[in-house]
Amino acid sequence: VLIEPMYVERHGRELMIGAVRDPVFGPAISFGLGGTMVEVIRDRAVALPPLNPYLARDLIRRTRASMALQPLRGAPAAAQEAIEDMLLRVSEIVCELPDVGAIDINPVIVTARGAVAVDARIGVMPVPQPQLLYRHMAIHPYPTELEGTFPIKGGRTLAVRPIRPEDAEREKAFIAGLSED
């Protein structure tokens, strides 16, 4: 048993990050206000991994906790990038380790300087062997193995890769620019 004093930060905001394994959808990542009032306040948004920076920001934006990250009653804005990074790391864990059944990080105390996980718990579950890669997930991670470069005329190279979520605006503009024929 390890007992330490509670981490206290003057302008710290208490948040929570979690993940659970749904039998149909696989891992689901949650984010919201944390601390001792987590069950009372019930501020939580959920997303399916894999997360990228855009999806992590969107997950944060969909909660009331996002307002607590802004400058508040004399406290400077909290380091949202630190929370985004924690969400991305949790996403990597549940994507790459199919035997992780649950993750509970509560509270995460975030300040202008960064974020600290004060209490964390990871639950494991048996996984039948052998298991196909990412079979435990509804959405598979971006297939980097399909990226490649090819030589073209003039000594240049052409980069070819699968579409990414951040390509959406450019794809819309491309489609809008096509002729009716």
Regions found by a protein language model. Give the residues of each.
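ATP-dependent carboxylate/acyl-activation modules
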Residues: 1-181
